[in-house]
Regions:
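Extracellular and secretory-pathway beta-repeat/beta-biased strand scaffolds
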Residues: 1-222
Length: 222
């Protein structure tokens, strides 16, 4: 479920991606990267009921059988300088998750310089500052039923172009691709989203965690 503005789960809402025969499923909730809205989990003041998200697997005694909850929301900066995300959480019960991934998104309009490699340095610097100041528990509140070790906070970097978007500005034998494995934030990877109103031109390799790309004779790898 992705909303352009607000996304609200009512106090009695149940999202069930659990299973009795395999690994649990994935529930994705989020807002558009430039949204000023909120992802809200309500609580019933009378009964105390809160939304339930079930991603449990077949065997609750096997941690890796659990499913995944992915929250994709814009970043925020608090009055005290700490950083958070656009989530208002009065209480939500998460059942059986092996991990809860929080993608804290910032959108960059790169129309004036529509090259992925030329935009990553600034985005990486912003992401490192954001993660260093992150107060994730204050930003999300309490997601009950899941251990703290299941939380993963990672920066989402969305590069948007009003025209074409090209992976490499100057592709060559020595500049044949982008290796994202060097971009880590407390051990977590970035989540890179590329959007182009025109053409998305992949004129090199894009990898994370593999061997260094090998240049082709014309400098382009497809």
């Amino acid at each position: 479920l992705i909303a352009g503005n607000n996304l609200e789960l009512g106090a009695h809402a149940v999202l069930n991606a659990g299973t009795t025969a395999a690994r649990g499923g994935t529930v994705t909730l989020g807002l558009a990267g430039n949204s000023s809205g909120m992802l809200t989990f309500d609580v019933d003041a009378g009964s105390g009921s809160t939304p339930t998200i079930n991603v449990a697997g077949a065997d609750p005694n096997i941690a890796q059988n659990g499913g995944q909850l992915w929250l994709r929301v814009p970043r925020t900066v608090n009055a005290d300088g700490t950083t958070g995300v656009r989530i208002s959480n009065s209480g939500v019960h998460v059942v059986g998750a092996r991990e809860i991934d929080v993608e804290a998104v910032k959108v960059y309009d790169v129309t004036g310089s529509p090259y992925v490699d030329a935009s990553l340095a600034m985005a990486d610097s912003d992401a490192r500052a954001y993660i260093a100041a992150a107060n994730i528990k204050a930003g999300i509140g309490s997601l009950t039923g899941t251990s703290v070790t299941a939380f993963h906070l990672m920066p989402g970097i969305e590069l948007d172009s009003g025209g074409n978007l090209r992976l490499l500005q100057n592709a060559s034998r020595t500049n044949s691709g982008i290796d994202l494995h060097t971009y880590r934030y407390n051990g977590e990877p970035m989540v890179l989203t590329l959007r182009a109103a025109g053409s998305l031109l992949i004129n090199g390799s894009l990898s994370d965690g593999f061997a260094a790309p090998v240049g082709s004779p014309d400098g382009n790898i497809f």
